[in-house]
Every structure is written in structure tokens, then in C-alpha cells.
A protein has these predicted regions:
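Outer-membrane beta-barrel pore domains and translocons
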Residues: 20, 35-37, 60-64, 105-109, ...
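Outer-membrane beta-barrel "beta-signal"
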Residues: 175-187
């Protein structure tokens, strides 16, 4: 079984386990996140297994976009955009409104990569678009303010690493780092 299939199987099992526990959760929230694992913008559902602290999970959907350079094949660069689905297991430390958030997860995505060709060696090349599956794993270290009135604000850092993405150039960077900000509301 290749790495992609193993990762997909592991994520589906994690999602099934967390969905079963979600029925007992006492704290749930929905939020809009800029940057971070979504790259541009995304929507997240977050839930604790008990109370408003300890272990929980987050699932989301987001829009990703990026630009890159291909020195040999596309001197004009590449443009990548697509949809991503991050899944994270996280832990909240703290007793009141202010908490430290720690998490690990993976983001699965389907991306369209457009290579903008130009003139190379006197020959003109046309743009090429490829659709590709890509994924990366990420960590999460953040500050979470969750007020008694229901407002939730998250600010943090989500470093990510890609191991093998099947050639999706947007995701081929080995060490990605991204700050994020998120605003949400308790459900």
C-alpha cells in the first residue's frame, strides 16, 4: 500500500472515530480562518469531546492558491489553486477563556496547476493545466480566546511538511510555515 493510500485510510479512520465521539461533545464552534492550513481562507468546525478544554478535533474546507517558478519547464511560472480539507486532532490547555491550542493534522486537497509557458529557445509554448491530488501534514500552536458570550478568536502558527504529493508543485515545498487568524462563534 503506498503512502497516499495509507494516509487516506488513517484519516478516514480518525474521522469516523471523532464523528462517533462528537455526539457527546459539549462545546462546538464554527469559524472562518485566514491563511494557516487553508492557505487563503477556510471554514472550520471544531468540537471538544468534553467541556471546553482537553482533547477535540477540527475539520474544515478551504480555498488554496499559490504561485511558483519552474526554471526549466515554465519560465513564466505556475499558478495553483484548489480546494483543501484539513482534519486535525487538537488539545486545549487552560481553564478559563484563554487557552493554549496544540494540534496535529493533515490537509487533503485537489488542485489545478496551470503552467504558463513562454518562448524557450525560439519556440513558443502554450499554457498547460493539470489537476492533481496533494496533501501535507501540519502542526498547530496557537492562542485561543473563547468568551462566555460565545465569541472565539484564534491566532497561531501552523507549520506543515509535505512528504510526497504526486508532483503537485504548489505542495512540493518541504517545509511550509503559516500564521493564521480565525474568528468564530460557539454553536
Amino acid at each position: 500500500m503506498n503512502t497516499t493510500k495509507k494516509l487516506m485510510t488513517m484519516l478516514l479512520v480518525m474521522l469516523a472515530i471523532t464523528a462517533g465521539h462528537a455526539q457527546d461533545a459539549t462545546e462546538r464552534s464554527i469559524s472562518v480562518e485566514a491563511l494557516g492550513v487553508h492557505n487563503i481562507v477556510g471554514i472550520n468546525f471544531d468540537s471538544r469531546f468534553r467541556g471546553n478544554h482537553g482533547i477535540g478535533f477540527r475539520v474544515g474546507v478551504g480555498y488554496a492558491q499559490g504561485k511558483g517558478k519552474h526554471i526549466y519547464f515554465s519560465p513564466s511560472g505556475t499558478k495553483t489553486q484548489g480546494v483543501a480539507f484539513p482534519i486535525e486532532i487538537n488539545y486545549l490547555l487552560g481553564k478559563k477563556e484563554q487557552k493554549l491550542e496544540l494540534g496535529l493534522g493533515a490537509s487533503l486537497g485537489y488542485y489545478g496547476e496551470r503552467m504558463e509557458f513562454g518562448i524557450i529557445g525560439g519556440h513558443q509554448y502554450m499554457p498547460v493545466t493539470e489537476k492533481k491530488f496533494g496533501y501535507f501534514v501540519f502542526g498547530n500552536i496557537g492562542y485561543r480566546l473563547q468568551t462566555n458570550s460565545g465569541l472565539m478568536i484564534r491566532i497561531g502558527w501552523a507549520p506543515s511538511i509535505n512528504f510526497d504529493d504526486g508532483g503537485c508543485h504548489y505542495l512540493q515545498r518541504r517545509l511550509l510555515s503559516s500564521l493564521y487568524i480565525s474568528v468564530g462563534w460557539r454553536l
